[in-house]
């Protein structure tokens, strides 16, 4: 059983990806350069026979005997690329095959080391004092005007009103005699003015 891959459908791959020396032998198919360690079989049966006889019987595998017809075998091999399990499509002669578990040649490091350091610690130098000075409150008491205390009691006992109104100018049990007489005089003037207006 042979595995054959059409080279014309493959993209152009540079040999520098694998970092190995390319072989001097190269064949160009459809404008794609492929470095190979092995020579392609020339399109004549004699060259194909020499190629087959140059190999030891132990090295001849199913891919070498793909067809009994030499021309058909050459047609198959000329459009095929040798492959192995580790490296996939062998585009270059490589003395060291890539392991299938770690494909280091195809790895691209997308990690970015950012040289940015953000310091989230903020030092706040704000101090709030809740202590209040009481010296001002003492001064405020001194600045307040001291009004004289109003005496509710009358100066003399002669002017005390009774429950019944009297016109003699004397009253009993009256605490606001001065305000009473002032209001009484004002009411008399208002009454006299109303009578005159009528």
From Swiss-Prot:
Question: Which keywords does this chain's UniProt record carry?
Answer: Glycoprotein, Host cytoplasm, Magnesium, Metal-binding, Nucleotide-binding, Phosphoprotein, RNA-binding
Q: Which domain of life is it from?
A: Viruses
The protein's matches in InterPro entries, at most eight in alphabetical order, are given as: Rotavirus_A/C_NSP5 (IPR002512)
Record protein name field: Non-structural protein 5
The Gene Ontology biological process annotation of the record reads: viral genome replication
Q: Does the keyword Zinc-finger apply?
A: no
Q: How does it assemble?
A: Homodimer. Interacts with VP1. Interacts with VP2. Interacts with NSP2; this interaction leads to up-regulation of NSP5 hyperphosphorylation and formation of virus factories. Interacts with NSP6. Participates in the selective exclusion of host proteins from stress granules (SG) and P bodies (PB). Also participates in the sequestration of these remodeled organelles in viral factories.
| Biological role | Plays an essential role in the viral genome replication. Participates, together with NSP2, in the formation of viral factories (viroplasms), which are large inclusions in the host cytoplasm where replication intermediates are assembled and viral RNA replication takes place. Orchestrates the recruitment of viroplasmic proteins such as capsid proteins to these factories. Participates in the selective exclusion of host proteins from stress granules (SG) and P bodies (PB). Also participates in the sequestration of these remodeled organelles in viral factories.
Name its cellular compartments: Host cytoplasm
One of the record's GO molecular function terms? magnesium ion binding
- One matching Pfam family is Rota_NS26
In its record, the post-translational modification comment is:
O-glycosylated. Hyperphosphorylated on serine residues, when in dimeric form. Phosphorylation by host CK1 is required for the hyperphosphorylation of NSP5 dimer.
Residue positions of the PTM Phosphoserine?
67, 154, 156, 164, 166
Q: Which family does it belong to?
A: Belongs to the rotavirus NSP5 family.
Tell me the residue numbers annotated for binding Mg(2+).
92
Which cofactors, if any, are listed as required?
Mg(2+)
**One cellular component term from this protein's GO annotations in UniProt:** host cell cytoplasm
Instruction: Please state the protein's primary subcellular location.
Output: host cell
């Amino acid at each position: 059983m042979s595995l054959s891959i059409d080279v014309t459908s493959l993209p152009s791959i540079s040999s520098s990806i694998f970092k190995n020396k390319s072989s001097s032998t190269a064949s160009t198919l459809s404008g794609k350069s492929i470095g190979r360690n092995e020579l392609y079989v020339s399109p004549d049966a004699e060259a194909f026979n020499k190629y087959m006889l140059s190999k030891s019987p132990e090295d001849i595998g199913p891919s070498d005997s793909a067809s009994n017809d030499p021309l058909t075998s050459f047609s198959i091999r000329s459009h095929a690329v040798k492959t192995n399990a580790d490296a996939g499509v062998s585009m270059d002669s490589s003395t060291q095959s890539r392991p299938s578990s770690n494909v280091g040649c195809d790895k691209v490091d997308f990690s970015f080391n950012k040289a940015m350091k953000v310091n989230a610690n903020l030092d706040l130098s704000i101090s709030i004092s809740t202590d209040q000075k009481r010296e001002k409150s003492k001064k405020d008491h001194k600045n307040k005007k001291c009004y004289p205390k109003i005496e509710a009691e009358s100066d003399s006992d002669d002017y005390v009103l009774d429950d019944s109104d009297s016109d003699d100018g004397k009253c009993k049990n009256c605490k606001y005699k001065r305000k009473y007489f002032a209001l009484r005089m004002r009411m008399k003037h208002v009454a006299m003015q109303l009578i005159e207006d009528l």
